[in-house]
Curated annotation (Swiss-Prot):
Mode of membrane association: Multi-pass membrane protein
Keyword flag Ribosomal protein: no
Protein's recorded name: Fructose import permease protein FrcC
Family: Belongs to the binding-protein-dependent transport system permease family.
Keywords in alphabetical order: Cell inner membrane, Cell membrane, Membrane, Sugar transport, Transmembrane, Transmembrane helix, Transport
């Protein structure tokens, strides 16, 4: 009995101490964030907010200045048609830039793919549908080569894609002999090549299938990037590749898949380009690489990787389209468009640097 009482005594003392102890939970001083800090955090968590705000404000501004001439179904759909190609190529560029890379070859891959589609049909007599598949395959192959050089040989994306840009551009001119395939010939013998240039009406609005594929592509990639493991890996690789590797992500395979998909999307843009201009021209789309980077940067996607929304890229492309058409309707010198777009690019990068302080 004495041993039992001795054993129970420490237990009773522990219960007494526990009963007398404070039940307050440890707390830290709460510092209210300033309005500026709240804004900073909001923009960090919603990267597409800034381009959306700029887009809405620019629409309102040109609407007030131009009135009904700007706010018409025809004008709004014309803006969409103008940015369809940039939006598709911008989607390809977005994937690469999210990994902290850059692809200067997107425009050249787009044009080469369109030339392959045209030349295989009219030079070799391939069925147009098979020529389209071959063009898509060439685009994916170019992207695969880019990805392999970046991921396996550890070469800088800027250097790799700069070299690929020159190689593909030269190959394009050498292979096509700078020959343009006329729109009339395509329409008569291979109308599928012009498919994305066909249009349909909804009320007074005229849409092309190129616009439809751009919107569907952006929505699909938004879902993939935000709702799938592959999409999360894209952001992880761009944010910190070493941490992603430690977390079990195969960074090499991811980079190759991203660049390959980017090349495939560029080839899709090449198909849409034929529909847009009607013909197959080796000189078309010369500035697509710069225009795609512009849409991505204005769209709030960080050039340092790991942050941004593909919806922001679409808003960025629309901002460029709104400014271009709005200033043209005002009768201003076209150089003002480039000046304002240049300012927007610098401001967008400055805002990105400011927002990145939150993560730091």
């Amino acid at each position: 009995m004495g041993e039992t009482n001795t054993a129970a005594q420490p237990s009773q003392e522990f219960e007494k101490v526990l009963a007398d102890s404070s039940t307050d939970v440890a707390s830290f001083d709460a510092h209210d964030k300033t309005l500026l800090q709240k804004l900073q955090h909001f923009l960090h968590s919603s990267p597409a907010a800034v381009p959306l705000i700029v887009l809405v404000l620019s629409l309102i501004a040109f609407g007030v200045i131009l009135g009904g001439k700007f706010f018409s179904a025809f004008t709004m759909t014309l803006i969409l048609q103008q940015v369809a190609i940039v939006g598709i190529v911008g989607a390809a560029q977005t994937l690469v830039i999210l990994t902290a890379g850059i692809d200067l070859s997107v425009g050249a891959i787009m044009v080469l793919s369109s030339v392959i589609m045209g030349q295989f049909t009219f030079r070799y007599g391939f069925p147009p549908a098979l020529s389209v598949i071959c063009g898509l395959g060439v685009g994916a192959l170019c992207g695969y080569i880019n990805g392999t050089l970046v991921a396996r040989m550890k070469l800088p994306p800027f250097i790799v894609t700069l070299g690929m840009w020159q190689i593909v551009l030269a190959s394009n001119f050498l292979y096509s002999a700078n020959e343009t395939i006329r729109a009339q010939d395509i329409s008569a013998n291979a109308s599928i090549l012009q498919f994305f240039g066909q249009n349909f009406r909804i009320g007074n609005a005229v849409f092309t299938y190129g616009v439809v594929v751009m919107v569907l592509l952006v929505c699909l990639l938004w879902y993939v990037l935000n709702r799938t493991a592959w999409g999360r890996y894209v952001y992880a690789v761009g944010d910190d590749p070493e941490a992603a590797k430690l977390a079990g992500v195969n960074v090499t395979r991811m980079l190759i898949s991203i660049y390959t998909l980017s090349g495939l999307i560029c080839a899709l843009a090449g198909w849409a380009l034929i529909g847009r201009i009607g013909s197959v021209s080796p000189t078309a789309g010369q500035f697509a690489n710069i225009e795609s980077i512009t849409a991505v940067v204005i769209g709030g996607i960080s050039l340092f990787g790991g942050r941004g929304s593909i919806m922001g890229m679409l808003f960025g492309a629309l901002i460029v389209g709104v400014f271009s058409l709005g200033l043209r309707l005002m009768g201003t010198d076209p150089q003002w468009t480039y000046l304002l777009i240049g300012l927007l690019i610098i401001i967008a990068v400055a805002i990105d640097q400011w927002i990145r302080k939150v993560a730091a």
